[in-house]
């Protein structure tokens, strides 16, 4: 029944006059959208995730202010809201004298792909081809390749390549490279290698770059023999074997544990007149760091200095993370200073590696000082930074400092997600005398229209019932029932002690917080 409802809704939304022609220029492009308006419409989409929700009726009030620029910004903000974002896009297209930008079409393809709405994606592309809404270029298919690869559907990615001709596109070597790169990036290397073998039947001549992509793919899954076979085939076909190809094989050897073989390859590169670059040295640094051998990593770093080569931020981050794992946080700070001197500006991951050490060791003063240092260097904390610091502060009872950091989030352009709210609520619930404050954060989350995890609702309800505060349970449940978010409304029954018939929302249900782990025993 639900499938029929969704299908009929999509068909109704697609009913657009056939006479509408493609216009590549954005409507009202000169009028930048208000950030508040973008936030407001994004909130509406978030609150209307259910296919049965009357999203279009709610959007009517915004019609006079809709521009192609606004649509782009909303779509970028709502990349994790596949179905409502699609409905919003189709609704905007029906506004008189409105035309989407080419960028908006590409963003929507990416949204539908990342949310695994592949049936909708192909319907959208077929309809766009029929009515000539926008030019379906190779770049659109590159987005589709990446989406299928991320969804662990490598065979479908290959089928998408074969369907390019249906849309008037003759695949070329660049398209093949993009497909192979997408597959290898998600470790579907065997599928990539198999499809590569069939590519000759399409009349596509592989380039040196094509071979290098496959070699890097085998390196990614630590298979040096597979990488060597591709490399040897490259030589047999008289391809120009450049530094990129040698680095790829070097990476494969080192990642598979054959660092000695990698060093021999490194020497061979020099004999052939290939001058190693920073990445060539970085391969050894990463290999030594993975083995926990910081001393050898530093020796390679010193050798790079002699050649006036500077590692990139990613390589510095790898060393810093290894130093912290080896309890050498002071050396990590020295390397942090060296990064800045070399012009490799530390990023959030750099600071998070050190922050994780301080939080694991309950070094609250050093953690807060590091947060201040991030402010001075204009490096914005992310959700990992905040979650680590807030967990630490609540764990040791520094509630005043936790509140101060929470209130400063908006100044750092960070807006709490469900994971960050969960850190506060779960932590405070377990602290004596902080149940009321936990309820306050729960109410803030409900007011923001952010659906809580089922475990959060259950924990808070059980604690309130245990303290005989059923009146507070009723207040919270009533607030959830009145929420503008349909998802929050659905969860009100859990606050009232009943189980929903639909699947429960867990900590792993948010793509945005897929690597968030709730510390049940340490808060």
Curated annotation (Swiss-Prot):
Residues 509-523 have a biased composition (Acidic residues). It is found in: Mitochondrion. This is Pentatricopeptide repeat-containing protein At1g52640, mitochondrial. It comes from the Eukaryota. Its main location: mitochondrion. It comes from Arabidopsis thaliana. Residues 1-5 form a transit peptide. Belongs to the PPR family. P subfamily.
